[in-house]
Amino acid sequence: MEVIPAVDIKDGSCVRLKKGDFNKRRVYSTSPVDVALYWEKHGASRLHIVDLDGAKSGWPTHLKTIREIALRVNIPLQVGGGIRSLKVIKKYLDSGVDRIILGTVALKNPELVKRALDNFGSNRIVVGVDARGGKVATEGWLKTSQVTVEDIISEMEEVGVKTFIYTDINRDGMLKGPDIEGIKRVLKSTKARIIASGGISSRQDLINLKAIGIKAAIVGKALYEGNLPLEVLNQYP
């Protein structure tokens, strides 16, 4: 299993939120670049970077910082947050980013996702499905739609998406374990690759995810708080 450290950027700092609440954040470093280098040094094979300000505003805010991270590290980056046009996708890819995460735009403009896939390929474009109570949340998790997780995955799979990042918002940053039953339902609904995110707090959580067929998981707070040893980044089977 691939364990992917999360680097969430807000107001120029590396932070973690609780349940996606912008008012409940903890700053771990004022240098996201240093944090990225730290995770690489300790064995990370990939980084998951989110521009939280961009997710909220709909326009990338920390492109310069993310570009610097791409220049400084030698591992692939997957980036999301405020990416809602082909022009911005191209900017990130040209900056050295490996994979683009599309979230809000998948719900609001599925045609753009199709065009992105046609232009850049399914290995470069993934869709983030952020769920609250089984429904898809958008706009940096500030709004919750009436569209179900299964429905958006089915629609995106039809246009060619091969990889989804599934996040349970109510567990994100809470260290209460992932929603195993919810993830099982998602896995049953699709043949696409699912990357799990939200609530992971221990080795046992990783074992449980692997047991149901998850091959990669994004971990944030559990790594920053030391609940998980750094060895999971390069030794976890």
Swiss-Prot record:
EC assignment: 5.3.1.16
Predominant place of localization: cytoplasm
Cellular-component GO terms for this entry: cytoplasm
Keyword Isomerase assigned: yes
Keywords: Amino-acid biosynthesis, Cytoplasm, Histidine biosynthesis, Isomerase
Pfam families the UniProt entry points to: His_biosynth
Pathway annotation: Amino-acid biosynthesis; L-histidine biosynthesis; L-histidine from 5-phospho-alpha-D-ribose 1-diphosphate: step 4/9
InterPro entries xref list: Aldolase_TIM, His_biosynth, HisA_bact_arch, Isoase_HisA-like, Isoase_HisA-like_bact, RibuloseP-bd_barrel
Compartment annotation: Cytoplasm
Active site per database record: D8 (proton acceptor), D130 (proton donor)
Single GO term (MF): 1-(5-phosphoribosyl)-5-[(5-phosphoribosylamino)methylideneamino]imidazole-4-carboxamide isomerase activity
Catalysed reaction equations from the record: 1-(5-phospho-beta-D-ribosyl)-5-[(5-phospho-beta-D-ribosylamino)methylideneamino]imidazole-4-carboxamide = 5-[(5-phospho-1-deoxy-D-ribulos-1-ylimino)methylamino]-1-(5-phospho-beta-D-ribosyl)imidazole-4-carboxamide
Domain of life of the organism encoding this protein: Bacteria
Coiled coil segments of this chain: none
GO aspect biological process, one term: L-histidine biosynthetic process
Similarity-based family: Belongs to the HisA/HisF family.
Protein known as: 1-(5-phosphoribosyl)-5-[(5-phosphoribosylamino)methylideneamino] imidazole-4-carboxamide isomerase
Gene symbol of the encoding locus: hisA
